[in-house]
Design a protein with these regions (language model features):
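Conserved glycine-rich SAM-binding loop
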Residues: 169
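Class I S-adenosyl-L-methionine-dependent methyltransferase catalytic core
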Residues: 1-154, 158-164, 173-218
């Protein structure tokens, strides 16, 4: 693993407890939405990936998680925050990810809360069906494209920022950080964790394969 990427398999509150107030310049997180995505399908009749029968998306994170997240990070980008607004302060700087789904049964996009005092921004990158990831099957139910994370880093992170991800999932953010460091010279560091050991193992395998490639422009 790259020296600027540090990912552990543990509970996110245990991870955050080790860091002082305001240690991370930016947290980019994708916590459970509390809507049972593990029971949904990918549009082809197949169930979304759910390891070991764990219904991890039955509820949103507790108040203790949010207390720690806002303690250790100066700014936050939170996917699915429209399901957890009761935990969040008001903000004008939301993000809309346009998935380019067209006329089908999938959601047109997803929302992310940000703590930045900016106008709402939208970004479009197609993400339709089980094989949206450049023809590669997804390894996590809420996996997001690397291109989306690269856009977030380019527009919301600053050079040398310390980034936190408390729900690592498929590891797309790590591939994006590696690309932005190599191509844009951003000198970012990423600290993250994933609770599920199977998702963690799959993400580590994916990151090692992707970051070893000479070109990361996908």
């Amino acid at each position: 693993m790259k020296e600027y990427i540090n990912i552990t398999c543990e509970d996110n509150r245990a991870l955050m407890a080790r860091y002082p107030d305001g240690y991370f310049e930016l947290a980019i997180v994708d916590p459970p939405y509390g809507i049972g995505v593990t029971r949904m399908t990918l549009g082809n009749g197949k169930r979304k990936i759910n390891r070991g029968g764990l219904e991890w998306d039955n509820s949103t994170p507790c108040q203790g998680y949010w207390n720690e997240l806002f303690r250790v990070s100066k700014n936050q980008i939170i996917w699915g925050a429209n399901y957890m607004t009761n935990f969040l302060p008001p903000s004008m700087g939301w993000i809309y990810w346009d998935k380019g789904t067209g006329l089908n049964d999938f959601s047109d996009g997803e929302l992310a809360y940000t703590s930045f005092n900016r106008a709402l921004r939208s970004y479009k990158v197609s993400w339709v069906g089980a094989n949206a990831n450049n023809g590669t099957p997804r390894i996590h139910p809420t996996e997001k494209p690397v291109a989306l994370y690269k856009w977030l880093l380019k527009n919301y992170a600053k050079q040398g920022d310390k980034i936190l991800d408390t729900h690592f999932g498929s590891g797309s953010i790590a591939i994006a950080v590696d690309s932005m460091n190599k191509v844009e010279g951003m000198n970012l560091t990423l600290t993250g964790c994933e609770l599920d050991p199977d998702y963690y193992a799959d993400a580590m395998k994916r990151i090692k394969a992707k970051t070893a490639q000479r070109s990361l422009f996908q």
